């Protein structure tokens, strides 16, 4: 008898790159559904952490990748230009409303894109200091971990001159100030305490994803950017997970009425293939040659997939679709909250939604163990959803933008049942899955 796929995975692939919550073993997928090796279908409310922006087996991506693979324009942009990468760069530049001349840097992931943005800023400006937020997960390379503030990376070496601020969380407000102004006051105080001209970059997520799917108070990002720019600090918007139509707008920063100096994209840009991008002023990305490169950067097959994603977003008006379906999902989650007291807060924009679980709605004590059991039971019932947050108690919903309303309703029914059957999962069953 053939050994089960998950067992083979355990024997052959190292744990360094695993973030597992239950024994999911995938043999295929279609639309917003994953297929296990026994043929069981599961509704995917994670979308591979947002990477499967168009779902699985989308015809536009299949056609684009097949054509690019059949007649590949090389394999990289390092030492030769290739049409898919150049065309994708032009398309991305046309989508960005920033003033002045901008260029593109291509990478494989949000991790290398955020690191490249930071390194380029330091090289171009001579300023190595950086502002970021507690709870922020900007990547898993040495460079991107240096200015990440997530608790899982607490032991990583941090950048010299790092200023780490609380992220504005209306559900758990810093100094009991839901407006976030107390954080801006803290920022002003910290900037006054460091040498002028020492801070080069400020990284912020317009929705903090891995920190708990937190939507900041209206106007916070604009006020934050104004303070930074008054000190000559470039504002970098990390939209790796929440950008490109997911929030209900093409770019998530559009909700906030400001335009960042630099935009970082990834995950959904490749529609499931490794692809990321930095959009930045030309003087930043032209500051040096051969300074931030890897051999397969600008790969034409990945770039072709990226073009297919952007064309589908435009043709099918996926921002409007994400807004409508996200509202449907959050309305359904709100109905669940009426029946399940574990649910403390529901938040999000478009198809980037979060549901925070608490032991008690008054004390808001994080329900970490219950969260792990809930998603495990949901998996057993046929639903894929993961948790995020500094306390591991926020369910994150980032399904394919193409998910059907039928699948949303079905997923809500399964989640409702999982809440009711939480006791069916033992501590022993979840103990082997570290999660976050």
Curated annotation (Swiss-Prot):
Pyridoxal 5'-phosphate binds at residues 110-111, 137, 238-241, 295. Pfam families: Aminotran_3. Signal peptide: none annotated. GO terms for molecular function: 2-aminohexano-6-lactam racemase activity; pyridoxal phosphate binding; transaminase activity. PROSITE patterns: AA_TRANSFER_CLASS_3. Gene3D superfamilies: Aspartate Aminotransferase, domain 1, Type I PLP-dependent aspartate aminotransferase-like (Major domain). The modification N6-(pyridoxal phosphate)lysine is found at residue 267. The keyword Iron-sulfur does not apply. Its cofactor is pyridoxal 5'-phosphate. This is 2-aminohexano-6-lactam racemase. It comes from Achromobacter obae.
